[in-house]
């Protein structure tokens, strides 16, 4: 058995019905679309969500929410990533230089994920309550 000799079992794959190829095929002339009407035309049919002229559901329901533009330029940093750094002071520029966060990030927040044993000084970064406790327990400090 080789890759070039593999083929499906006999009768496993059935050829698709060819529409509009004569009355003998069973799907000739109108091609299974019926006579006249919007759906029989090429390019016919209604758009998704169309309810026959009734006010559609997506317009009946109120709008809600928004996309925060600040969230697009905010990165999250995990505690174990701080432990990998060779520096004792951490700020946003160091995180960008070490490629822990994308260069276009303007803000960063440290979250509690993993552990940290080395004392580090955090400058100008957001820190969650759990991460703050872990950093201070390791002997580090947070400068706003």
UniProtKB/Swiss-Prot annotation:
Annotated region (Disordered), positions in chain: 1-53
Q: How does it assemble?
A: Part of the 50S ribosomal subunit.
Record-linked InterPro entries: Ribosomal_uL15, Ribosomal_uL15/eL18, Ribosomal_uL15/eL18_sf, Ribosomal_uL15_bac-type, Ribosomal_uL15_CS
Q: Does the keyword Heme apply?
A: no
Function comment: Binds to the 23S rRNA.
Mind telling me which GO cellular component terms the entry cites?
cytosolic large ribosomal subunit
- Keyword RNA-binding included in the entry's annotation: yes
Set out the biological process GO terms recorded for this chain's protein. translation
A Pfam family per the record: Ribosomal_L27A
Which organism's genome codes for this protein?
Hamiltonella defensa subsp. Acyrthosiphon pisum (strain 5AT)
Q: Which residues cross the membrane?
A: none
Query: Composition bias, kind Gly residues: at what positions?
Result: 21-31
Record keywords, A-Z: Ribonucleoprotein, Ribosomal protein, RNA-binding, rRNA-binding
The identity of this protein, by name, is: Large ribosomal subunit protein uL15
Superkingdom of origin = Bacteria
A single Gene Ontology molecular function, please? structural constituent of ribosome
Q: Which family does it belong to?
A: Belongs to the universal ribosomal protein uL15 family.
């Amino acid at each position: 058995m080789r890759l070039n000799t593999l083929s499906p079992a006999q009768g496993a794959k059935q050829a698709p019905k060819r529409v509009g190829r004569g009355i003998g095929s069973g799907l000739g002339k109108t091609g299974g679309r019926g006579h006249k009407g919007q759906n029989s035309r090429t390019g016919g049919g209604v758009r998704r969500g169309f309810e026959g002229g009734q006010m559609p559901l997506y317009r009946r329901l109120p709008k809600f929410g928004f996309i925060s533009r600040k969230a697009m330029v905010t990165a999250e940093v995990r505690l174990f990533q701080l432990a990998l750094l060779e520096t004792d002071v951490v700020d946003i520029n160091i995180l960008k230089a070490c490629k822990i966060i994308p260069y276009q990030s303007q803000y960063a927040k440290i979250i509690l994920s993993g552990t940290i044993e080395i004392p580090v000084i955090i400058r100008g970064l957001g820190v969650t309550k759990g991460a703050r406790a872990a950093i201070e327990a390791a002997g580090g400090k947070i400068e706003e």
